[in-house]
Amino acid sequence: MVDVANIHLPVLLDDCVNLMAPALEHENAIAVDCTLGLAGHSIAFLKAAPQARLIGIDRDSEALGLATERMEREGLADRFIPVHAAFDQLDQVLADQDIERVDAVFMDLGLSSLQIDETDRGFSYSHDAPLDMRMDVSQPLTAERILATYDAAELVRIFKEYGEERFSRQIARAIVARRDKEPFTTTAQLNRLVDEVVPQAHRPAGNPAKRVFQALRIEVNGELDKLASTLPQAANRLHVGGRLVVESYHSLEDKTVKSFMAQGLRVDVPAGLPVIPPDAQPFFTDLTRGAIKADEHEIAANPRSASVRLRAVEVSREIPSRWRKRFTQTAQGLNDVKIQGSASPGRAKNTARIRTRRG
């Protein structure tokens, strides 16, 4: 049995609770944790907000089961609804629950400790494992398949775009040249190749393959495209006074979150107008004044928190209809949002329903 208490350390837990709890103080408040993992954050949210209910979404069925067991042990199961889905299915999840609006949405975009510490999915370059990298093992696309089928140009694209890898072209060419003789099936093989290609003098701190692993994981799971689709869904589902709280762990995620939130933090008129119409005023309030980072004490206790950036906004007024329409189009991939990587699970699966609504 997995000892979840030892492998899951929620990052910036107190900060996240302090940001979420004010939106959950009223009766029948509803929160959504789009990245449930092992429920470390969600358990704290429910304990801090005894009137709230929480929908926990995760595409990893193993994590979902373990999180549900934790909720039962904590006596919180009656206020918890587990849903097997990808987080970009947020609209569908809420529709299935007959919920129009919610009070808080949380996203922790890092890999769960369970996924990192399990050696059979290939998320970590520290262990030899199959090149899988799927968060949802029912999905068809794996890292092995990418390395076997993508041409050099496609590999260069994902290594450069998703890994910000300086030697993307050289690594891609080496993979294509070698794979016919030696198919890439394990993380050790990929580690060795990157080690051979990247010059010693130009290596980042840590394992030289970490950017390549990141790029493959993002491509396999469609992470950035799902994030770009989910953020506008979340905004459109929040009550006035509702909060969107997001933890990201690499610059591409943080840029996506920061850019999305900035849309609602600025005045929506051309510069120089003498009077700003009420409908053009910002509809978000910045709750974190930029990003909150882990301090040295948290990093010492949990090294995986070193790269975290926590951002949060509150919906300060009703989002204008033109922005709601724009957000809906973005969520559907109609505003230059690329949808790549693996498909989402066909339909959200849940075992319970929330029957109370906000009055």
Swiss-Prot record:
Q: Where is the composition biased (Basic residues)?
A: 350-359
Give the E.C. number(s). Answer: 2.1.1.199
GO annotation terms (biological process): rRNA base methylation
Q: Which residues bind S-adenosyl-L-methionine?
A: A39, G40, H41, D58, F87, D108, Q115
**A GO molecular-function descriptor:** rRNA (cytosine-N4-)-methyltransferase activity
UniProt KW keywords: Cytoplasm, Methyltransferase, rRNA processing, S-adenosyl-L-methionine, Transferase
- State the name under which the record lists this protein: Ribosomal RNA small subunit methyltransferase H
Q: Which gene encodes it?
A: rsmH
